[in-house]
Amino acid sequence: MDAAHTVLLLIGYQNDYFSPTGILHDVVEESANPQTVLSNTLDLIQRLAPSPVYMVDTPIVFTDDYRELVKPIGILKTIKELGAFRVGSDGVKTIPELQAFADRIITIPGKRGLNAFSNTALEILFQQWGISDIVIAGAISSICVDSTGRHAHGLGYQVTILSDCTLGRNSVEQAFYCEQIFPLYAQTMTHHELLQKLDIHPVNL
């Protein structure tokens, strides 16, 4: 894995998931350890900041009336019914912890569904940057992380999903996806293993 041709794709790091007052905060059980996932992600970003690895944030944002969701089902129906990720709301904002790295993380708008490539410029940008490896972190493992990872694999990218930087709805779901689903199309590893693979050594910050 070459750092100069690798991108860290950050999915769902928004207030509606990670803030205690977020509309979808209760979708994630405490057993999934959301604060640990966030802490691991921030540690990874800090370590990668001086490196040539690209870092991209893909927030999901819906219009006021959710007109882009025609007869939604599943999680998208829940999002519409609860009013989550609505444009202009506090819940749609990227969490402050990630905003602190705004000079290093590129935000790509347009995501309005489960797959981060849909309705965004990700594929074009990754081609321009010469990306070969996509590393995925974020929420929710069984939904947006899995959908995006499968699509990236289908496009021919080498996909890595970080087991300690992705968030399932509970610990059982997270373990199942990391052990049984993700390995079907991706490498699964911790962020420490990724840093070793990229030859980025821990430093005291």
Regions found by a protein language model. Name each.
Residues 1-7, 17, 47-51, 66-68, ...:
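Active-site-adjacent betaalpha module
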Residues 27-39, 79-89:
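A short acidic, glycine-rich active-site loop
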Residues 16-30:
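Glycine-rich N-terminal loop/short-helix segment of MobA-like nucleotidyltransferase
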Residues 13, 60, 164:
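Active-site loop/turn elements of alpha/beta-hydrolase fold enzymes
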